[in-house]
Amino acid sequence: MIKLRLKRFGKKKEASFRIVACNSTSRRDGRPLQELGFYNPRTKETRLDTEALRIRLTQGAQPTDVVRTLLEKGGLLEKKVRPSIAIGKANLEKEKIAKAKSKESESANKEAES
C-alpha cells in the first residue's frame, strides 16, 4: 500500500518535512517513490505538487493524518469531520450548560432560604 507521509530533514531541532509517496512498510526517512511537496512547521510554509498529488490519490494512496490536514488546507481534499473531536466538543458544551444550570439552581435555593 502506498502512503503519503512526511519525510524529515533539516538541522537538529529545526526540522522541515517533505511530503512523499512511499511504501507503507518503508522507513520514515527511507527512499521515497516520489516527492510531492514541502512543509516547514516553523514558518508554516507549504508547497504542494497538486497534479502529482491528485494522481497518487486517484491511484489509492492513503495520506497520514498530518498530510491529510495539509491537503485539506491546500484544497485537495474535502474537510473530514472527525467524529471524536465533534463528539468531544458537544459533550463539553453539554457539561458547561449543566454546570451553569446547577449553579443557577443553587443560588436560587440560597436566596429562597434567606
UniProtKB/Swiss-Prot annotation:
SUPFAM superfamilies: Ribosomal protein S16 (SSF54565). This is Small ribosomal subunit protein bS16. PANTHER family: 30S RIBOSOMAL PROTEIN S16, SMALL RIBOSOMAL SUBUNIT PROTEIN BS16M. Disulfide bonds: none annotated. HAMAP family: Ribosomal_bS16. One of its GO terms (cellular component) is cytoplasm. Keywords: Ribonucleoprotein, Ribosomal protein. It comes from the Bacteria. One of its GO terms (biological process) is translation. It holds the Pfam family Ribosomal_S16. It comes from Prochlorococcus marinus (strain MIT 9515). One of its GO terms (molecular function) is structural constituent of ribosome.
